[in-house]
Amino acid sequence: MSDAQDKLLQGEMNMTLNMTFMTSARDAVGKCLAELGDKHDDMLVLTADVDTSSRIQAFKEKYPDRCYNVGIAEQNLMSVSAGLAHEGFRPLAFAFAPFASMRCYEQVRTDICYSKLPVVIIGNGAGYSNGASGCTHCGLEDSALMVACDNMTVLEPGDPFQIAKLLEAAMDLNAPVYIRLGREAASSLYPEDAKYEIGKAMIPREGDDGAFICSGIMVHFAMEAAKRIHDELGKEIRVVDM
């Protein structure tokens, strides 16, 4: 594997939110947080000691009194977020994906979802994308756990522009939302002005000989696989981005 590929998988390349460059999901979130804060006076950002990893610096500099680091205590993160939501705030809770789901599952299920509170949970480093930190930081079960919670909507965007639009949609949903993000860098699949609807699939590639149904970073792998199948076998595979 080349150095560039290795950096790509680790999400460590320096990128900007641009159609011709690549960006990681967390960089895309960080870029739009401050703008969301301008629109939502009641928006708060909370982290489990992952400020740098979550790319919240721009928001923190602009709104220092609306950022809270509760420490490496994900159960506390979710309960505090629930309490703030009860008081009329709109919390965004950031943690690594396995800890945002498994370590604090009771608090997510009972404190947030049971009361259908508008808390947006952002799980970073999903899948194997945080593998450099060891198996403890690999989030493979988070989607299944979150989907099982009543009133919870799970989103796994894989396009930088899609991330920004879906984060804004999550803020308007007025219900619990889990956004699953990897560390990998990805290019844009859709134009900046593309329309997204929660629960509706996008079709970045058409085809009648088969289909790949996927989400998140896997959409990019599916697009590459579909291209290779076309080039080597002459078959047209549709890619469905859920």
Question: Model-flagged regions — what are they?
Answer:
Residues 181, 214-216, 241-242:
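Active-site proximal loops enriched in glycine and acidic residues that flank catalytic Cys/His/Asp
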